Amino acid sequence: MNLFSSFTLMTFSILLYPILLSFTDQYNNNLFPNHVKTSIICAFLFSLIPTLMFINSGYDMIISNWHWMTIQTLNLTMSFKMDMFSMMFVPVALFVTWSIMEFSLWYMHSDPYINRFFKYLLLFLITMIILVTANNLFQLFIGWEGVGIMSFLLIGWWYGRPDANTAALQAVLYNRIGDIGFVLSMAWFLMHSSSWEFQQRFSSQNSSNILPLLGLILAAAGKSAQFGLHPWLPSAMEGPTPVSALLHSSTMVVAGVFLLIRFYPFIKNNQLVQSIIMCLGAITTLFTAICALTQNDIKKIIAFSTSSQLGLMMVTIGINQPYLAFFHICTHAFFKAMLFMCSGSIIHNLNDEQDIRKMGGLFKTLPFTSSELTVGSLTLTGTPYLTGFYSKDLIIESANTSYTNAWALSITLIATSLTAIYSTRIIFLLIRSKPRFVPLSPINENNPLLNNAIKRLLIGSIFAGFLITNNMTPMSIQQMTMPWYLKLTALIVTILGFMMAMELNNLSLYFKYKTTSQHVKFSNLLGFFPSTMHRLFPNTNLLISHNSASTLLDLIWLEKSTPKLLSSTQLMDSTLSSNQTGLIKLYFLSFLLSMLMVTMLII
């Protein structure tokens, strides 16, 4: 086990080398991005050794070698939890990041601040690894906030664009809502046990309390873009494509799901919390799949597919299968990163065009990228024997084993069929149809940095599911029998989705609607959620605040209470006391009244 811990710490040390190098003169060198890529390659190779040792032994290990401080009865230490989740996730994250870094060398080659960009990407990965390997809430919170800060810096990388700045702020604000739940949960754990260590937390008797679990659900909903806190995820597409690939595959968006997986010993004993997670995930996976149907921005379609898959992971946790949720995290990383990199290649070759209606016929002009985009889309839908099939099929099978999951299962099956529909739509509009882009676009995909990066992820999208299935503990699963129609549910639903997509494509060639239907508007406008939450409620609050300030403060207090009251009182007094009006009728009336009074007095 000493060798195990040594290689693990060596992996982390290799990743820190480029960060330390950035404080020297080498940071301004053009070779700094290559140093970062080489460090990630070495870290990936070193991480395979402790992973294979763990697969062989199957024993968890905790590395605790630095005591930071003691606050009364609270001990803050830096400790790493080397269990199945961390040991399987770290090589996957490093492998995917290796490909993204190599892709970034091609995609960001003309950026004047490419060295800083690579440094931020590396910090993004390091903070995610800190989150995954943390053995206490304090260290996990460092990684949690780290991925949030780095996402803000990377989403707003092109800070000269107002949309990028807005998207970065939106990501921070929505995640702040989730952070409130995380901080409150940390405070509850500290008050009731005086410890943030996972071993002490899981062995305590307070696991039945629902309050900290609700805080963790809120935190996971914010970080993993669940329904209600989801608008920041498609808006984050304003960042560079390598950022989108890393953010959606193996870093920030899966952090919320991983948080619930890490705290699963609490969740498994609380059926109400499991039901909340299952319902939240089911609503998210269906709503975002509906939104993806009519989007025209290729990156936003893939972003909504990510949110839909995150909802599926939440459903998996809700049906008492955290290991399957983690398995789907690992398989999802490969094909989602490949989809973003393929879309980035297409966007780059078409002069930053992202509208799929202005593409088409790319199989002849970009055959390599188009082929891998097709494979990635098929993997996303759960095509048999590709990586996505191994996890999605098991999830739907597990949901089929209990009638209590019928509601979530039905919604998940509908979302799975919709996944096949919008994936087929991408394939039809980008590859099969006629070219609709500017003919003068300089198209060239013959770059080894681009091709090698996507090839590695293509191999992962085909074989990673099989490899992880056969090396993920437990090695053998309990035998069970079920009807053949339940076993083939995922495949049947996917085929139905493909058939529906083909039928809709044929109908669109012959039928033209004069007006857009309300259903299409609901999908295209994201369920009217941004216009409601970002416009209606803020404008209503501003209007109420403006009217309250102008009516209550200005008109009543400042005008009628002090200066205007004095002026009106003085005007009334002066009017009553003054008899010089200049009107002959009033003078004659006053004369008559005076004569009348004198006459009455004499008589």
From Swiss-Prot:
It is found in: Mitochondrion inner membrane. Pfam families: NADH5_C, Proton_antipo_M, Proton_antipo_N. The chain crosses the membrane at residues 3-23, 39-59, 87-107, 117-137, 140-160, 171-191, 210-230, 241-261, 272-292, 301-320, 325-347, 360-382, 411-431, 457-477, 482-502, 583-603. GO terms for molecular function: NADH dehydrogenase (ubiquinone) activity. The lineage of its organism: Eukaryota, Metazoa, Chordata, Craniata, Vertebrata. Keywords: Electron transport, Membrane, Mitochondrion, Mitochondrion inner membrane, NAD, Respiratory chain, Translocase, Transmembrane, Transmembrane helix, Transport, Ubiquinone. Belongs to the complex I subunit 5 family. GO terms for biological process: ATP synthesis coupled electron transport; electron transport coupled proton transport. This is NADH-ubiquinone oxidoreductase chain 5. It comes from Glis glis.
